UniProtKB/Swiss-Prot annotation:
It comes from the Bacteria. The keyword Amino-acid biosynthesis does not apply. One of its GO terms (biological process) is protein folding. NCBIfam families: hscB, PRK00294.1. The lineage of its organism: Bacteria, Pseudomonadati, Pseudomonadota, Gammaproteobacteria, Pseudomonadales. PANTHER family: IRON-SULFUR CLUSTER CO-CHAPERONE PROTEIN HSCB. This is Co-chaperone protein HscB homolog. It comes from Pseudomonas putida (strain ATCC 700007 / DSM 6899 / JCM 31910 / BCRC 17059 / LMG 24140 / F1). Co-chaperone involved in the maturation of iron-sulfur cluster-containing proteins. Seems to help targeting proteins to be folded toward HscA. GO terms for cellular component: iron-sulfur cluster transfer complex. PROSITE patterns: DNAJ_2.
Length: 173
């Protein structure tokens, strides 16, 4: 038995554009149904199945609620499997990455919490733009190579956003 499509678990059609609030609501509903505690008095087999369903549901939810992970998953289920680590051949984006990293390093050295907040807003705007670009590209036939490039950019920005949140927490303490 294979793992069901993440979208099918939530009764959704594969799409990049999702209503994340509805996804979260549906996740909570389904999680209650398959929660292993509900099967505490069931047979060992039923408990194992409940645990597997719960794990699959959690994995599907984590994938679909994250834009970069959702983009990678869409590419994979469409037959465009993307290796995890690939050198990015995009000089403009590489330059932008270096500039963002230098700026973040300066903000850290200066312990500039307000500056980190401004940086975080700019990063969020860049993420929103990339998400829209990917969604438009995904909806256009024959754009899978561009979709892959955009997904890689999304992954980088997601990682950078995590680093920004960590810096913000350190500076806020």
């Amino acid at each position: 038995m294979g793992t069901p499509c993440h979208y099918a678990l939530f009764d959704l059609q594969p799409s990049f554009r999702l209503d994340l609030d509805k996804l979260a609501t549906r996740y909570r509903e389904l999680a209650r149904e398959v929660h292993p505690d509900r099967f505490a008095d069931a047979s060992e087999r039923e408990q194992r199945v409940a645990l597997e369903k719960s794990a699959a549901l959690n994995d599907a939810y984590q994938t679909l609620r994250s834009a970069p992970r959702r983009a990678r998953y869409l590419l994979a289920i469409s037959g465009h499997e993307v290796p995890q680590e690939v050198t990015v051949h995009d000089p403009d984006f590489l330059l932008q990455q270096m500039q963002w990293r230098e700026e973040l390093e300066e903000l850290q050295d200066e312990a500039d919490l307000d500056g980190v907040g401004v940086f975080k807003k700019r990063l969020k705007a860049a993420q929103d733009t990339l998400n829209e670009d990917f969604a438009g590209c995904w909806d256009a036939p024959g754009e899978r190579d561009k979709a892959e490039r955009l997904m890689r950019r999304m992954q980088f920005l997601d990682k950078l956003a995590q680093e920004v949140r960590q810096l913000e927490e350190r500076l806020d303490d």
